C-alpha cells in the first residue's frame, strides 16, 4: 500500500514503482538477463524472494537489478556513515605570542602548531604588539619566518607574515 501523505517521487524506485515500458535486468549474481518488461522482471524477482531495484534511470533502457533491497539500503547507509567519518573539516587554530617570547615558550608554541597541523587544521600564528612595541614589526616578522622554517616539513605558508592593526599574522596549511 502506498502512503498518500508522502509524495511518490521521494520513494526509491523498487518493484511496482518502476514505470518504464522495458528495462535491462541484471540478476542477483551479476549476470545480465536482458531487456524485458518490468512485469516479467518483477515475477523473476519474486520467484527468488528478492526485490527489483532501479539502479540507473538515465540509461537507455533503464537498468534494474534483482537484489535484497533491505541489505542494499543498509550497505548504502553504511558507506555514507564511513564517508562522513573520514571527512574532516579543517579548522583554523591560532597560536598567539609576543615578539619578545622566551625560547622555551617559543618551543611550546611550535609544538602546539605541529599538533594542529598533524590533525589537519590550519594554523594562524599571531604576534601581538602593545604600546610602542609596534616599532619592532621587523622582529615579529623574523619570529614568524623562523616559525615557518621550523614547521616547513609539516606546513606550507598560505599567507606570508602581514601586519593588521596591532597584530602581525601568518597562515600555515598542512602539507598533503
From Swiss-Prot:
Q: Which domain of life is it from?
A: Bacteria
| Molecular function GO terms recorded | ribosome binding; translation initiation factor activity
**Example of a GO biological process term:** ribosome disassembly
Its GO CC terms are: cytosol; membrane
InterPro entries per UniProt: T_IF-3_C_sf, T_IF-3_N_sf, Translation_initiation_fac3_CS, Translation_initiation_fac_3, Translation_initiation_fac_3_C, Translation_initiation_fac_3_N
Q: SUPFAM superfamilies per the record? A: Translation initiation factor IF3, C-terminal domain, Translation initiation factor IF3, N-terminal domain
Looking at the keywords, is Glycosyltransferase present? no
Q: Which UniProt keywords apply?
A: Cytoplasm, Initiation factor, Protein biosynthesis
The cross-references to Pfam families, in alphabetical order and at most eight, read: IF3_C, IF3_N
Here the disulfide bonds are none
Asked if Ubl conjugation is a keyword of the record, the answer is no
Q: What is its main location?
A: cytoplasm
Query: Where found?
Result: Cytoplasm
PANTHER family membership: TRANSLATION INITIATION FACTOR IF-3, TRANSLATION INITIATION FACTOR IF-3, MITOCHONDRIAL
Q: How does it assemble?
A: Monomer.
Role summary: IF-3 binds to the 30S ribosomal subunit and shifts the equilibrium between 70S ribosomes and their 50S and 30S subunits in favor of the free subunits, thus enhancing the availability of 30S subunits on which protein synthesis initiation begins.
Task: Please report which protein family the annotation says this sequence is part of.
Answer: Belongs to the IF-3 family.
State the protein's name.
Translation initiation factor IF-3
Question: What's the name of its gene?
Answer: infC
Amino acid at each position: 500500500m502506498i502512503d498518500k501523505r508522502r509524495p511518490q517521487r521521494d520513494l526509491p524506485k523498487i518493484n511496482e514503482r518502476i514505470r518504464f515500458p522495458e528495462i535491462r535486468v541484471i540478476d542477483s549474481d551479476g549476470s545480465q538477463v536482458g531487456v524485458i518488461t518490468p512485469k516479467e522482471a518483477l515475477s523473476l524477482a519474486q520467484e527468488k524472494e528478492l526485490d527489483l531495484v532501479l539502479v540507473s534511470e538515465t540509461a537507455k533502457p533503464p537498468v534494474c537489478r534483482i537484489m535484497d533491497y533491505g541489505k542494499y539500503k543498509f550497505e548504502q547507509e553504511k558507506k555514507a556513515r564511513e564517508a562522513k567519518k573520514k571527512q574532516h573539516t579543517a579548522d583554523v587554530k591560532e597560536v598567539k605570542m609576543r615578539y619578545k617570547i622566551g625560547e622555551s615558550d617559543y618551543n611550546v608554541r611550535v609544538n602546539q602548531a605541529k599538533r594542529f597541523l598533524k590533525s589537519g587544521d590550519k594554523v594562524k600564528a599571531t604576534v601581538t604588539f602593545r604600546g610602542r612595541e609596534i616599532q619592532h614589526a621587523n622582529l615579529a616578522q623574523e619570529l614568524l619566518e623562523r616559525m615557518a622554517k621550523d614547521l616547513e616539513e609539516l606546513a606550507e605558508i598560505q599567507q606570508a607574515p602581514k601586519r593588521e592593526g596591532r597584530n602581525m599574522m601568518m597562515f600555515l596549511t598542512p602539507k598533503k
